[in-house]
Design a protein with these regions (language model features):
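Non-heme di-metal
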Residues: 1-161
């Protein structure tokens, strides 16, 4: 029960939830910038693959072995800066989004903040996974998280493309 680990989790959560420009709010502004009404976004029913993604991440993050939850978080956060960069490029090229607009802010924040988050989490996992068993559990968590993320994207393609 290492307080430094809990502090890192808390710091990550504070970064995402604090202030008027918290991550859920930035996502809503992105959706509005794409022409969606806030109320419509809030009332959207999740597709099967989205529900499975959320369920798997919740299961992993609530696991008593916190290296399992950290591994799932790392799987996600490790990809985000590059994904955000690609999203920004696509939104500019295909949708006419401009730097500094609310439409891009969600991705701009993740492009920079998650570079730090992923390194901190990677270092913590390296410290925490001090046995072969923990390393195997971490890898299994990453595999489930990655599979869930890929399935989520397949669901988006199935429904919206």
């Amino acid at each position: 029960d290492d307080i430094s680990v809990r502090q890192e989790i808390l710091e990550n959560l504070i970064d995402e939830e604090r202030g008027d420009e918290n991550h859920p709010e930035l996502w809503m502004r992105f959706a509005e910038g794409m022409g969606k009404k806030r109320e419509d976004v809030k009332n959207t029913v999740a597709i099967k693959e989205t529900k499975e993604l959320v369920d798997n991440f919740m299961k992993l993050s609530k696991d008593d072995r916190y290296h399992v939850g950290f591994s799932a978080l790392y799987c996600y956060e490790s990809m985000i800066p590059e994904i955000a960069e690609n999203k920004i490029d696509g939104l500019k090229k295909y949708y006419g989004a401009k730097d500094g607009e609310d439409t891009l802010k969600f991705f701009e924040v993740h492009q920079s903040a998650d570079i730090i988050h992923r390194q901190v989490i990677k270092d913590l996992i390296g410290d925490i996974c001090d046995t072969d068993e923990k390393k195997e559990e971490a890898l299994r968590a990453i595999e489930l998280a990655l599979s869930s993320l890929n399935n989520f994207l397949s669901g988006m393609e199935r429904v919206y493309c």
